[in-house]
Amino acid sequence: MGKEPRHGRVTVFALLLPLFVLSFSSARKGSVLPENIAGEEWPYYGHDAGGMRYSPLTQINRENVSTLKVAWTFHTRDISEGRGDRKRSGFETTPLLVDGTLYLTTPFNRVIALDPETGTQRWAYDPRIELDGDYGDGLVNRGAATWLDSARSSGQRCRRRIFESTQDARLVAIDAGSGAACADFGKGGQVSLSDVSGYHAGWYHMTSPPAVIDDLVIVGSAIDDNHRVDMARGVLRAYDARTGTLRWSWHPIALNQPSAAANANAKTFRSGAGNAWSIMAVDPERDLIFVPTGSASPDYYGGLRPGDDKWANSVVALRARTGEVAWGFQLVHHDLWDFDSASPPLLTTLRHDGKDVPVVIQGNKAGLLYVLNRDTGKPVFPVEERPVPQSDVPGEVTSPTQPFPLAPPPLAAETLSAEGAWGPTPEDREACRKTIAQLRNEGIFTPPSLKGTLMVPGNIGGMTWSGYAFDPRHSLLVTNTNNIVALARLIPRAKYAQRGSHAEDGDYGDQTGAPYGLYRRFLQSPSDLPCSAPPWGVLTAIDMTEGKIGWQVPLGSMQDFGGVHKQQIPAGSISLGGPIVTAGGVVFIAGTTDSCIRGFDIETGKELWKATSS
C-alpha cells in the first residue's frame, strides 16, 4: 500500500533547535529501561529487549511537536513495483541507533549504516539475495539485531555485530564499524537456514529481525500460506553469536500428536508451519524468550491436523539456554482463519490487585489482547473458553471453544450483518448486502465453508506485525487496528482443478494434499471500498491497570481510494505500521494508506501534528 517513495526512503524530522532526530519508520522503545542502555539509543527493534517502544526522551513533546521539520532524507533506491518475476517491495524497516550510528535494512535486504545527524551513508552491506524469488510477502525486511562481544576489545573487528536474517534463508553477521562480513561466523559470515524438512525456495524465508539474548542469536521463519498441507515446519533455531554453531532448535508443532489423532479416530497428523514469523521479545534476567507463533498449514482447512495444533497460534516462553518450553498459552485453537499471533510480545510490569506483576502482552489478528503473567503464563485478566460455531465441511473437526479475554475488550468488530453493510452509494450497499446474505455468517470464529463464510475480522483485521507501544507513566498501551472483513470459501478438489476461466477476482490457495482448495478475498463494494462500516482503521489507548479503553480515534484517511465518492469516505485507514510513545507525551505512528506520519496526545488521542512521507 502507499506510493512509491514509501518503499525506498528514510525521512528524519527534527526540531529546529536543538537538533533532535526521529526516524520516520515505526521505531520502538522500552518502559523500564535496562541500566546499561542509554535512553538516546535504540538498540533493539522495540528499543528495549521487551519491545515496549517507549522513548524516555522529552525534547519532542506536546508543546513543540507542531514545529517538527524534515532534517534530512536518505533514498535507498531499493524499490520494486512488482513487474515481471519480481515481487513488489515494502519498506517496513525499524532502524537501530547504536554507538552513534543508524542501521537500517532495505527491501532488498541490504544493510546500510548512516550518520544519524546528516543522513550520510557510512557503509552498505549487500547479501545479494535472489531478487526474483517467489516470496509470499514480497520484497520485505523489517530490521536487524545487534550484539556486543564482551570478549573482544574496543576497536577489534566484529566486537559489535549486526545480524540480519534474509529472505533467501540465511543468517548473516556484519561488523558494525565497517560493514564487512564477520568471517568467523558460519562460513564467511553467514549460516544457511534452508536445512529444514519441506524447504521450498521462496516459500520459506525470513522477514523479521533475529532475537539476541546473552551470546545467542535466534531466528524463526516466514512460511507462505495455503500452498500445500505439508509445508516446511516452523522450527526456531538458536545460534552461537560468535561462531554460528547451532546450539538448539525447537519445533512449535510436534510431529507426533497422539492425543489429537486419538480424538479424531486415529487420523494421520499432516501439517507444517506454526512458525514464528513475527518479532520475538527476550527477558535476560529470567533467561526467557517469548515467541509468537502463526497458524499450522494449511490455514483454512484442518481436517488433516486434528486437535488444537499446539503450539501454533500461541505465545510460548522458552528457556534461552536450552530451548525448553517454560510455558505456553494458545490464543486460537485449531486455527481456520489465519489468526496468527502476529504482534510482537510486549514485556512490562503492571500494578494489579495491589501488586507489581511482570507480564507479557500478546495480541493477534482476531483483535484480541491477552495479558499473561510472565513467570507462569497464567492470565492476569480472566480468559474464558466460549462455544463457537462448528464446521459443516466433511472431514473438518473444529475446536468446540475458543479463549476470549474478558479484558481488554475486543479491538476489532466481531460481527457484521447484511443490514449493517456499508457503501458510499445505495448501489454499493445493496451489492454488499446481497453478498453477505449468501454467506455463512455467525460472527467471529465462523469456520470456512463450501458456500462461503464471512470472516469477521479478515486476516489483516485486528492487530498485525506492527504491534503496540506502552507508556509506563500512564499505564497506557497504544495500538492501531484494522476493521476489514473477508470472504473464504473451500472448493472441492475436482471442482477446484476445473476452475480455469471461471476463476473469480481474489486469491486462490491450492492447499495441495487437502480435499479442498481455497478462494478468498476482502469484501468490497463495486466502488472497491470495504463492505464493513468505517472507520477501517483506528488508534486505541488502553488503560492496562483496568483493562479498559481510554480513548479511540480514527487513524488516517482512505479518501484517495474514493474516486468520485471521495468526499463520502470517513476518516480511518488500513494501517500496517505500529506506534511509538515518548516521555514527551506524544504517540507517533505512520503506516497508513495516505502516506502520512502523525503525532497524537497520549492522554486524549488528539492529533497534534501530521506530515506526508511522499
Name each model-derived stretch.
Residues 30-79, 94-97, 539-540:
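Mature N-terminal segment immediately following signal peptide/propeptide cleavage
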Residues 2-13:
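Bacterial N-terminal signal peptides that target proteins for export
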Residues 24-58, 399-429, 433, 499, ...:
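N-terminal pre-domain segments of enzymes
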Residues 402, 407-486, 493-495, 538-541:
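Long, low-complexity segments enriched in small/aliphatic residues
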Residues 42-46, 88-108, 136-170, 202-228, ...:
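Repeat-blade elements of multi-bladed beta-propeller folds
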Residues 13-23:
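Bacterial N-terminal signal peptides
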Residues 66-79, 111-135, 148-153, 171-201, ...:
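Extracytoplasmic/lumenal domain signature
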Residues 52-60, 169-176, 456-457, 527-529, ...:
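Short aromatic-glycine motifs in intrinsically disordered, low-complexity regions
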